[in-house]
């Protein structure tokens, strides 16, 4: 099936992870000639990855990618596209599901998280049924075996990776010594941030620690401050 249009639904709960994955998927569809509409609930996060996006606008188009605010779309949803792509089990807006029941898309899918665990193979490609509406949904799990959905790799990925200047990138973030070991740090607020803070403070080797913004990072900073007292 070659869709002409796709609606991608995303509720952002994972810093830039969810936003980044769905934006990357939207760009791949656009490159294949499929018109994407990305519906998301935290456009201010998406705007950091998509320069030119106004996070206060209920609907916009940036670099060929349509973007819609989740609440605005949920209140007055469009007709279903050829392909409806739910991501990470976010559950579609109720009014939109009602429209899907009347005018079904060619395909409805749930794109789940990338995993190397064995159980993914038995869940990939499985059809699920809506509890009350005549909607069928295909579960798609990316992975690393031929019994999963595999990986999305852009045609120019290797060229861009070869051209990437790691030192210049780190310096642009304020790192003064890019030769040091570098740790990118992200955690949820429910993680044991006190233990992590103490572990980082106990390391004698100088490190560059890149902190992802969010509640978890704020908690880590607080824990480090308390531990130094």
Report the location of each language-model feature.
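Donor-nucleotide binding loops and adjacent catalytic segments primarily
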Residues: 168, 172-229
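Active-site regions of enzymes building and remodeling cell-envelope glycoconjugates
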Residues: 64-66, 137-139, 222-229
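A structural signal for isolated positions on well-ordered beta-strands in alpha/beta enzyme cores
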Residues: 7, 37, 109, 184, ...
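Structural alpha-beta junctions
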Residues: 31-35, 102-107, 133-136, 201-213, ...
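Active-site and donor-binding regions of nucleotide-sugar-utilizing enzymes
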Residues: 9-134
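Structural motif
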Residues: 5, 82-83, 182
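A nucleotide-sugar donor-handling region in carbohydrate enzymes
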Residues: 112-193
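Positively charged, low-complexity intrinsically disordered leader regions
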Residues: 1-6, 142
């Amino acid at each position: 099936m070659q869709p002409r249009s796709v609606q991608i639904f995303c509720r952002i709960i994972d810093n830039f992870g969810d936003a980044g994955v769905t934006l990357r998927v939207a760009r791949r569809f656009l490159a294949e000639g499929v018109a994407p509409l990305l519906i998301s609930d935290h456009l201010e996060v998406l705007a950091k990855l998509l320069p030119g996006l106004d996070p206060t606008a209920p609907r916009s188009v940036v670099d060929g990618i349509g973007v819609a605010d989740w609440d605005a779309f949920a209140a007055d949803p469009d007709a279903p596209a050829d392909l409806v792509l739910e991501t990470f089990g976010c559950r579609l807006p109720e009014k939109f599901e009602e429209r899907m029941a009347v005018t079904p898309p060619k395909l409805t899918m749930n794109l789940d998280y990338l995993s190397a665990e064995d159980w993914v193979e038995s869940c990939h490609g499985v059809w699920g049924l809506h509890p009350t509406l005549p909607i069928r949904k295909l579960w798609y799990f990316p992975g690393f075996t031929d019994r999963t959905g595999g990986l999305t790799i852009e045609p120019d990925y290797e060229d861009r990776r070869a051209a990437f200047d790691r030192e210049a990138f780190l310096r642009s973030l304020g790192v003064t010594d890019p030769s040091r070991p570098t740790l990118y740090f992200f955690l949820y607020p429910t993680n044991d941030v006190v233990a992590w803070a103490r572990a980082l403070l106990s390391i004698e080797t100088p490190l560059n620690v890149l902190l992802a913004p969010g509640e978890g990072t704020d908690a880590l900073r607080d824990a480090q401050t308390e531990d130094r007292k």
